[in-house]
Amino acid sequence: MINDIKKDAEARMKKTVEALGINFNKIRTGRAHPSILDGVSVSYYGSDTPLSQVANISVLDARTLSLSPWEKSMVPEIEKAIMKSDLGLNPVTTGELIRVPMPALTEESRKGYIKQAKTEAEQARVSIRNVRRDVLADVKELLKEKEISEDDDRRAQDDIQKITDKYVAEVDAALAVKEKDLMEI
């Protein structure tokens, strides 16, 4: 019973850390990475479609993305969608190929992105702590119903705290890596 609760807590905390990684990938570092364009949607036959579903996105070099639309007619639409996004990118079209150079980050924009990363990390920590709170409430409920002893309750609390500390440390490590990435010139 307690093991199921601990496994559930660990799974939920792991999902939080994975979601943080996805959010960190969306923060621009000045280096080209296909996930930067994840939030960009293109009008495709009247419906908004993610860019990755209408074009092949690849990294040309450290500072340039290359997009190959699957339909020639989509080139202007894709270009327009990238310009409209709030990413500050200006695509360059050469025939059927769209190149997206990554502008160098200014000191001010780096600090803004670091602040955004810290906010994302803090939200992940809060989410992990909320999972801990919910799980500890479940354990207390078992104790109240006399399904576990006080010793089991104490042991479960200690184990859950260790799991929480482990995932908070993972969040801190991910934040440190992202900050280092952002400060590289």
Swiss-Prot record:
Pfam families: RRF (PF01765). CDD domains: RRF. The keyword Cytoplasm applies. This is Ribosome-recycling factor. Gene3D superfamilies: 3.30.1360.40, Ribosome-recycling factor. InterPro entries: Ribosome_recyc_fac (IPR002661), Ribosome_recyc_fac_dom (IPR023584), RRF_sf (IPR036191). GO terms for cellular component: cytosol. Keywords: Cytoplasm, Protein biosynthesis. Responsible for the release of ribosomes from messenger RNA at the termination of protein biosynthesis. May increase the efficiency of translation by recycling ribosomes from one round of translation to another. The gene is frr. Belongs to the RRF family. It is found in: Cytoplasm. One of its GO terms (molecular function) is ribosomal large subunit binding. Signal peptide: none annotated. One of its GO terms (biological process) is cytoplasmic translational termination.
